[in-house]
Amino acid sequence: MKDNQNVNRRDAIKLGFGATVLGASGLSHAHDQGVKTPFPVEQVFIPIAGSDQEFPVRRIYCIGRNYAAHAIEMGSDPTREPPFFFQKPTDAIQFVAPNKIVDHPYPSLTKNYHYEVELVAALNKGGKNIPVDKALDLVYGYALGLDMTRRDLQRFMGDQKKPWEIGKSFDHSAPIGPIFPVAKTGHFIKGNIQLSVNGVVKQKADLSQMIWSVAEQISKLSEANELFPGDIIYSGTPENVGPVVRGDVIRCQINGLPDLSIKIV
């Protein structure tokens, strides 16, 4: 496959054949069934820290406005609005190795490109209507991530009462570090989360300030969608989101996880 220059065009994407699929209802492992397909399909994996194994990504869920101050700066009332979720395409993943500054391309169609640092939960179990007190049993591990956003497109579509997927779902819009198993880190209930641009702190909060905890997010999300192994959940960003331009270096931090750094190019 080395002669195919289009293969592995993004970090964390590997070549797979046929449909994948983690045992999801109605789906099968194509290679196990001997199914032949007319072309290869890229599959997305995230390295697991301290292991030669990789985490297969099924879906990327994101929660919106999950810190009170961020909800207010985005024009919402955090005291009364229920949680809402959106998705990014699986191949929006851009893996960012620890202790490196990875180039991140400034996307097309935008003049107002924003950062949002987030804790990411990775699931190895699934279910529907999961009670809050059982929800963390589904979590395999955690990672540090960024929900990169074309804010001008998001706002333009929102003002027109149209879906704002174009502002959130695009190539490389989900940078993420390695996944650390819960067995090594425990669950991230509290701890510092922050982001700096060119050494200046822009976002800083505590994970305990989430409006909806990771367990509550899993429970609420499972009411609307059956969850499966391989699903990951971006758990929301603190206040003070803002723009970056080419040449800026973003550094993300969560206590207990290695830093994540990208350079906008």
Regions found by a protein language model. Give the residues of each.
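Catalytic-pocket segment enriched in acidic/His residues
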Residues: 32-54, 97-98, 151-265
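Short, structured patches in soluble enzyme cores that scaffold and shape functional sites
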Residues: 117-119, 123-125, 143-148, 180, ...
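Extended, compositionally biased flexible segments
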Residues: 33-134
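A generic structural signal for short beta-strands and their flanking turns/coil linkers
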Residues: 80-82, 89, 115-119, 138-144, ...
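N-terminal secretory signal peptides and thylakoid transit peptides that target proteins
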Residues: 2-20
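Boundary at the C-terminal end of the N-terminal hydrophobic targeting segment
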Residues: 28-30
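Hydrophobic, well-structured mid-protein blocks that either form specific transmembrane helices
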Residues: 129-163
